[in-house]
Design a protein with these regions (language model features):
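Surface-exposed loop and turn segments in beta-propeller and other repeat-based domains
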Residues: 99-102, 156-167, 293-295
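Conserved N-terminal structural module of periplasmic/extracytoplasmic solute-binding proteins
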Residues: 27-85, 89-92, 103, 107-110, ...
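Bacterial N-terminal signal peptides that target proteins for export
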Residues: 2-12
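Hinge/lid segment of periplasmic solute-binding proteins
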Residues: 408-461, 475-479
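Helix-loop-helix "hinge/cap" segment bordering the ligand-binding cleft or interdomain interface
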Residues: 88, 147, 151, 445-546
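Bacterial N-terminal signal peptides
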Residues: 13-21
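Conserved small/polar residues in nucleotide/adenosyl-binding loops
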Residues: 548-555
Length: 559
C-alpha cells in the first residue's frame, strides 16, 4: 500500500529527525569511515519530469533520443489521449509526435535495422447483433513503421493467420534481430513467432511455459528470461534449432531479474530491482554497475531503462501517489566520486527493505545536500545468515547507524544497550512528546527511555448493537468471555473461524498469559480454557459462500 502525501511527508520528517539526531551523537566519526569506503565511480542522476500519464506502454532509445508511448485520460473530451513523445538528450527538449491510431493502441515499439520505429498496433473490434447488442468481439494486430524524425507512418502490415499468427493470439513482447526478423511472443498459447522482415513465417517456437521478458543484445541476438528451478533463467533463441538454448551460465545467480535491456558497452543490462549489472555472455559475467538506491531511484518503480551511445543510462519511472500517476525520466551519468559534492554517510541496517522506507530514504537523499543514507540489507539472500551477520556487526561495533527493526525483536537489543534513548534528541530538536500519540511512543519505551519510533499504527476495534451493549466502551478478556456465555444463542463474532478467533484472542491478550518481567507463561488457567471452549464452537473454516445462502446467520441473532 502506498503512503499518501501527508503520511509520506511525516515519514521523511521522522527519518530526517532520526538521521540528524544520530549524527549529533556520532560526532562525525562515521563520516571519516564512509569517505574511505566511497567507490571510485558513482552514477549521478539528472531528472526530467514527464508530467501526468495514466500509462507508459513502451519506451526505446535510438541514438541520443528516447521514444515513449503514453496514454492519459482527457477530462475535457472524455477520451483517452495517446501519442508518442521523444526526448533528445543533446538539445534537452521533448517533442510530441502526432500519432492517430483511432481506437487502437501501441503494444510495443522497436527499432528496425534501417532506423525506422516499428510499432506493434493492437485493435479490438466489437460486433453487434441485429438488435444493436454487443456480441463477442475480436482483436487484430499490425506492424506500423514510423520515421523517427518526421513521425510519418511509412508503412503498415497486418498480422494474421496468413502470416502464421493464430487468430486468438495475444501478442505482448516484440523484438527485432540484426537481420530484421520479428520476434513476437504469444501468451494465449505460449510460443514465439519469428517472422521475416516481409512477415513470412521463419519459425514458431513452442514453449512449455510463459516467459517473463524478451530482449535483444547489442549484436542483435534475441534472448528470453523465464523462471527455472534455481531462479530466473536467461536463454537464447536459437533459430537454427528453432528452440530455446540451455540456460546461460553466469558468475552470479540472480533470483529475481526484473528486466534486461540492450547494451552499448556490454551485451545487455540486467536489473534485479536493487542493482544494475552489465552482462558479458562470452565471459559469463555479471559486472555490477550501481545500486538503484545509491542513484536515488526506487528500483520497484523502474518501467524502462537503457544505455545511450556515450554510456549514460536513461531510466523511466512511474510513481502513483494515490491520486495521479507521475512519470519521470532520469539520466544517470557515471562520474568519479572525487568530482561529486561529498555528503556525510549514514547507514540504515535492515533484514528486508520495505518499499515505503525505500521511497522515504530516496526523498530524504534528494532533499538533503549534506547527508546521504545508504542501506545495508542483511537478509536479502538468506534470512538466517543475514541475522547472524547483523548480530556480529552489532557485537563488533561495526553495525549500522540506524536499524529498521520491523523484522527484529528490538527489546533484545535495547536491553543490551545497543540503541540510543531518543527522548533527549527529541527535546533538543524541539519535538514534543505531547504532540504525538503518547501511548504509542510508550510502546517503544523501556525503563522510561525511547528506543524506537514508528511512523504509523493501526487500531482494531469491535462494534455492536447499543441495545445490547449499552454505554460499554471497552472490556477485559474476562468481561468479553462473560458476555459470550450470556449470549450463547447469538452470533457475537460473525464470519470467524476457530483458528482466526484463537489467534485474535490470544495475540491481543498476551499480557493475560505472559509475565514479561519474569518470562513465565501461564496457558493452563481458566481464562485460556474459556477461550479454547469458545473457539471450539466456531466452524473450523469459515465459508464465505454462506453469506449468500439461507444458512447464513439471521441479522437478528447478531449482537
Amino acid at each position: 500500500m502506498k503512503l499518501n502525501k501527508k503520511r509520506k511527508t511525516l515519514f521523511v520528517a521522522v527519518l530526517m529527525f532520526l538521521f540528524l539526531s544520530l549524527l549529533a551523537g556520532c560526532g562525525g566519526k562515521k563520516t571519516e569511515e564512509a569517505d574511505t569506503e566511497r567507490p571510485e565511480y558513482i552514477y549521478v542522476p539528472e531528472y526530467f519530469n514527464l508530467g501526468n500519464s495514466d500509462y507508459i506502454g513502451s519506451a526505446i532509445n535510438y541514438e541520443n533520443e528516447v521514444f515513449y508511448y503514453t496514454e492519459a485520460w482527457d477530462d475535457e473530451t472524455g477520451k483517452s489521449r495517446t501519442g508518442i513523445s521523444k526526448y533528445n538528450f543533446e538539445s534537452r527538449k521533448s517533442e510530441m509526435i502526432s500519432l492517430d491510431v483511432g481506437e487502437a493502441s501501441v503494444s510495443a515499439m522497436q527499432i528496425t535495422p534501417d532506423g525506422k520505429i516499428a510499432l506493434l498496433i493492437y485493435e479490438w473490434t466489437n460486433t453487434e447483433d441485429e438488435n444493436g447488442e454487443y456480441q463477442d468481439g475480436s482483436g487484430s494486430y499490425a506492424l506500423w513503421y514510423m520515421d523517427p524524425e518526421s513521425g510519418e507512418i511509412t508503412g503498415q502490415k497486418e498480422l494474421s493467420e496468413e502470416n502464421g499468427v493464430a487468430k486468438d493470439a495475444y501478442l505482448g513482447s516484440f523484438y527485432i534481430d540484426a537481420q530484421g526478423n520479428n520476434y513476437l511472443f504469444n501468451s494465449s498459447d505460449p510460443c514465439i513467432y519469428v517472422l521475416s522482415g516481409d512477415l513470412q513465417m521463419v519459425a514458431a517456437i513452442s514453449l512449455s511455459d510463459y516467459i517473463n521478458q524478451m530482449f535483444a543484445s547489442k549484436d542483435g541476438e534475441i534472448y528470453v528470461t523465464l523462471y527455472g528451478n534455481t531462479g530466473t533463467e536467461i536463454r537464447k533463441i536459437d533459430l537454427t534449432k528453432k528452440a530455446l538454448s540451455d540456460p546461460l551460465k553466469f558468475d552470479k545467480e540472480l533470483m529475481n531479474i526484473n528486466g534486461c535491456m540492450t547494451g552499448i558497452s556490454c551485451d545487455f543490462l540486467v536489473n534485479d530491482q536493487n542493482t544494475v549489472y552489465a552482462a558479458d555472455v562470452t565471459a559469463g559475467t555479471f559486472t555490477k554497475l550501481f545500486d538503484w538506491l545509491d542513484a536515488d531511484v526506487n528500483g520497484n518503480n523502474v518501467n524502462y531503462f537503457g544505455e545511450l551511445p556515450d554510456g549514460r543510462i536513461w531510466v523511466i519511472t512511474s510513481t502513483y501517489d494515490g491520486n495521479n500517476n507521475e512519470a519521470e525520466l532520469l539520466l544517470l551519468e557515471k562520474k568519479k566520486s572525487s568530482e561529486v559534492a561529498q555528503k556525510e554517510e549514514v547507514t540504515l541496517g535492515t533484514l528486508w527493505l520495505d518499499d515505503n522506507v525505500k521511497s522515504a530514504i530516496i526523498d530524504f537523499n534528494k532533499s538533503s545536500d549534506k547527508y546521504h543514507i545508504s542501506v545495508k540489507t542483511y537478509g536479502q539472500d538468506d534470512w538466517e545468515s543475514g541475522l547472524t551477520q547483523f548480530n556480529a556487526d552489532v557485537a563488533s561495533g561495526s553495525g549500522p547507524d540506524l536499524v529498521d527493526f520491523s523484522n527484529l525483536n528490538y527489546t533484545l537489543y535495547a536491553e543490551k544497550g545497543v540503541f540510543e534513548d531518543l527522548y533527549p534528541y527529541m527535546e533538543k530538536s524541539g519535538l514534543k512528546k505531547e504532540n504525538y500519540v503518547e501511548n504509542v511512543l510508550e510502546a517503544y519505551e523501556m525503563d522510561g527511555k525511547l528506543y524506537g519510533f514508528t511512523t504509523e499504527f493501526s487500531i482494531y476495534t469491535i462494534v455492536g448493537k447499543q441495545s445490547v451493549l449499552g454505554e460499554l466502551s471497552g472490556w477485559t478478556l474476562s468481561e468479553m468471555m462473560d458476555f459470550i456465555d450470556q449470549h450463547k444463542d447469538s452470533e457475537v463474532f460473525p464470519y470467524a473461524s476457530q483458528q482466526y478467533m484463537l489467534y485474535l484472542l490470544v495475540y491481543n491478550n498476551m499480557d493475560e498469559f505472559i509475565d514479561w518481567e519474569s518470562g513465565k507463561c501461564s496457558f493452563d488457567g481458566p481464562e485460556f480454557a474459556r477461550i479454547l471452549e469458545y473457539t471450539k464452537t466456531l466452524p473450523e473454516q469459515y465459508n464465505d459462500c454462506l453469506l449468500y445462502t439461507s444458512d447464513a446467520a439471521d441479522d437478528s441473532l447478531r449482537v
